[in-house]
Amino acid sequence: AKYPQLLGTLPSKDSGVKYLLEGYLFPATYNYGEDADLESLIDQMLGAMNTNLSSYYSTIEAKNLTVNEVLTLASLVEKEGSTDQDRKDIASVFYNRLNQAMPLQSNIAILYAQGKLGQKTTLKEDAEIDTNIDSPFNVYKKEGLMPGPVDSPSLSALEATINPSKTDYLYFVANVETGAVYFANTYEEHAKNVEEHVNSKLTQSSSSSN
């Protein structure tokens, strides 16, 4: 089979994934002629992901991770943060939570389960997200990772996931409207961050719109 290292841990359809190759096609600009078929384009995108991951396969294996686990985690890191540093710190939060058997509690995975990922989300919508949705992608209710990725992670997200920061962070909250991310080691610190950087902004926006 082509790309055995990349596709060796591809999830099966009965794992609960929506699309088998979700997250495995590298996001980039591709040139193709009018007579190009879908199969050759997919092969080009898989080839690009394989090339970008080729120098990391040994590290992934050394860390006792599978390629699917890395792509799945990187797909969350991709959307949760926008800067390289934030992504490395976010990846560290996810690893720290996984190591302590804490649910990942990512809203990105919920939005994917709802079919809303990619749509603009307001602070209010983010705060009121349905964390009880019945889905294998609900990482509020289940421990561990989703069955597969929710988007195609960029090289920045892949690098952050393979070589994360070393922190004690267990929590983070992002202001979805500004992109700023706030990290915390304890729930108490996290609650303060949520209050200061999210809830206070919600109060301001609701009072200004009344």
Where are the language model's segments positioned?
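Bacterial extracytoplasmic/cell-wall-associated proteins, especially those involved in peptidoglycan
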Residues: 2-210
